[in-house]
Amino acid sequence: MSAPKKVVLAYSGGLDTSIILKWLQTEYGCEVVTFTADLGQGEELEPARAKAEMMGASDIYIEDVREEFVRDFVFPMFRANAVYEGLYLLGTSIARPLISKRLVEIAEETGADAIAHGATGKGNDQVRFELAAYALNPDIKVIAPWREWDLSSRTKLIDFAEKNQIPIAKDKRGEAPFSVDANLLHTSSEGKVLENPAVDAPDYVYQRTVNPEDAPDTPEYIEIGFEKGDAVSINGEAMSPATILTKLNEIGGKHGCGRLDLVEGRFVGMKSRGIYETPGGTLLLEAHRGIESITLDRGAMHLKDELMPRYAELIYNGFWFSPERTMLQAAIDASQTHVTGTVRLKLYKGLARTVGRWSDHSLYSEAHVTFEEDAGAYDQTDAAGFIQLNALRLKLLAARDRRLKS
């Protein structure tokens, strides 16, 4: 690749991307345009602007994309009840395609030769950023400094920062922070003591949730309203997608909901350990499953359950803009036509449990399932023929096996 003259950098204002900004200027002698997305990470973003200006960025983009993030990425994913490897709610994975989309758009707007990101050569994010970028612009050039430079450790990064007078953030204990990714859906923490999966994570790692043991001693009940699979209200109050997730984070975090300590299988082949906090997403997933339980037909629900692991894997691996994800999304969205109603959750010391659900689109018939008189709603003698028909092949198999044994 010929040396670029202008690069659009996904910039957080943190240590890694600040070093990358300086490295791009030094290595390529190019202009650097920074893009910082407000995904609801809870940080003041003006310091990122000031830092980029101080370091000589030629242009600075800081954009509030919270509503787009939740409406066009998080909510479609939650319609699928997507969970990777049984635990991970894909908080980091789902943010990457939106960031890549804006990187490509800004590159085209500014006439940049390339885009750059701060993902390491060991992780999934390099794959996610680049697959999304190439899906949107097959001719885009991507610079991944972690795969090029010799700054192969945190120690070398810090040395580079000190030599180039780049400020180094400290955590509240005065130490270099964990590797943290945050957005409106979740916060993840990796590295340092967490790299040993046998060691219990210290409580100071958690940023968004209280320790469940310290959560309120009184349960809280909330009601989440849905229309066609998407949350539209909390306790009867209509809200925008980002506002709903923000409010659910606040409520769930207060009760210690959504903490995960997990080891996941990365797309690049290795396993990694992380501490994930997804308070609002945990409540949203529980409630969405609750409303689906009374509005989705059994066949549709079971098919969704079969498709979900593949859908989740596509998002995890970076294939959001792939045709197969789009095809699955169309099927999932079609299933949500009648997923409308309200779910009541009980929140208590780290647990979020569905305790009520109702809908004008409900398939639940109390008349059919009652243990009392059903006024002829269901003829129990019909079950005999149903059982005999379903047993026929099993009887034939058993008869053959007995015959062969004798």
From Swiss-Prot:
CDD domains: ASS (cd01999). Pathway: Amino-acid biosynthesis; L-arginine biosynthesis; L-arginine from L-ornithine and carbamoyl phosphate: step 2/3. It comes from the Bacteria. L-citrulline binds at residues 88, 93, 124, 128, 179, 188, 264, 276. It catalyses: L-citrulline + L-aspartate + ATP = 2-(N(omega)-L-arginino)succinate + AMP + diphosphate + H(+). L-aspartate binds at residues 120, 124-125. Keywords: Amino-acid biosynthesis, Arginine biosynthesis, ATP-binding, Cytoplasm, Ligase, Nucleotide-binding. It is an enzyme of class 6 (ligase). One of its GO terms (biological process) is argininosuccinate metabolic process. Its main location: cytoplasm. It is found in: Cytoplasm. GO terms for molecular function: argininosuccinate synthase activity; ATP binding. Pfam families: Arginosuc_syn_C, Arginosuc_synth. PROSITE patterns: ARGININOSUCCIN_SYN_1, ARGININOSUCCIN_SYN_2. Gene3D superfamilies: Argininosuccinate synthetase, chain A, domain 2, HUPs, Single helix bin. Homotetramer. NCBIfam families: argG, PRK00509.1. Belongs to the argininosuccinate synthase family. Type 1 subfamily. This is Argininosuccinate synthase. It comes from Roseobacter denitrificans (strain ATCC 33942 / OCh 114) (Erythrobacter sp. (strain OCh 114)).
